[in-house]
């Protein structure tokens, strides 16, 4: 099994593309959802955040107040790095657990929905394939203005706050162009899924794990049938 990192930009159509992958039966892990999950009360990251940033980052119900925490780290790289040092290891642990579940269920690949895949680069080394949902800037701007009822200035400000899609497209192994008709984009998704399903890149890991399990089973057999009876 191998990992596919999927990203896009605001109003590029990433959510719609993910829905198509899910309809095709693909395994999808939303890293943003996972990041919110690991800071829930009772989890190690939640405890460490309170220890480091204080109880003022808590809501009345004990959840992390994301706005207050965001304000605390805004324009403060040291604090942001400290928060990342708390949350990123926990996110990776959850990612590994979820990925292993899909491995046991026989999936050939797992898609990780990672909004900041190329900005942070933290998870890039784990990705066998990278995919960007792209659209040209004029299309992106028009969609964002229509979807969020924004004027041109505000929409441009939101787009400019992100890494340009053209830059992401240059860094990605696969580009799904969502600039035109949705039927064309959907066809691209189906073709990419077919390509990934046919890939043999999942075999080395699966073979290695199965070999390891076979070795453990053989050892247990020897212990129970030959060594333990004479102990």
Swiss-Prot record:
SUPFAM superfamilies according to UniProt: P-loop containing nucleoside triphosphate hydrolases
Transmembrane segments: none
GO biological process, one term: coenzyme A biosynthetic process
Domain named DPCK: residues: 3-207
GO cellular component, one term: membrane
Keyword entries, A-Z: ATP-binding, Nucleotide-binding
Highest taxon above the source species: Eukaryota
Family membership noted in the UniProt record: Belongs to the CoaE family.
Protein name: Dephospho-CoA kinase domain-containing protein
Organism from which the protein derives: Homo sapiens
Lineage: Eukaryota, Metazoa, Chordata, Craniata, Vertebrata
Gene name of the record: DCAKD
């Amino acid at each position: 099994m191998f990992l596919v990192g999927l990203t896009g930009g605001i109003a590029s159509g990433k959510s719609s593309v993910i829905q198509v992958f899910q309809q095709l039966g693909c395994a999808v892990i939303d890293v943003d959802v996972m990041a919110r999950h690991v800071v829930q009360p009772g989890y190690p990251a939640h405890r460490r955040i309170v220890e480091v940033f204080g109880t003022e980052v808590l809501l009345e119900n004990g959840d992390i107040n994301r706005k207050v925490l965001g304000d605390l780290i805004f324009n403060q790289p040291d604090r942001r790095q400290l928060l990342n040092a708390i949350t990123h290891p926990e996110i990776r642990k959850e990612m590994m657990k979820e990925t292993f579940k899909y491995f046991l269920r026989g999936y050939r690949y797992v898609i990780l929905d990672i909004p900041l895949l190329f900005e942070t680069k933290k998870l890039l080394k784990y990705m066998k394939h990278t995919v960007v949902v792209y659209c040209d800037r004029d299309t992106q701007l028009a969609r964002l203005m229509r979807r969020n009822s924004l004027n041109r200035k505000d929409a441009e400000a939101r787009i400019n706050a992100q890494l340009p899609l053209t830059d992401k497209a240059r860094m990605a192994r696969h580009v799904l162009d969502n600039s035109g008709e949705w039927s064309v984009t959907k066809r691209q998704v189906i073709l990419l899924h077919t390509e990934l399903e046919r890939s043999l890149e999942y075999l080395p890991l699966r073979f290695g794990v199965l070999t390891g399990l076979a070795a453990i089973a053989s050892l247990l057999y020897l212990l129970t049938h030959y060594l333990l009876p004479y102990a």
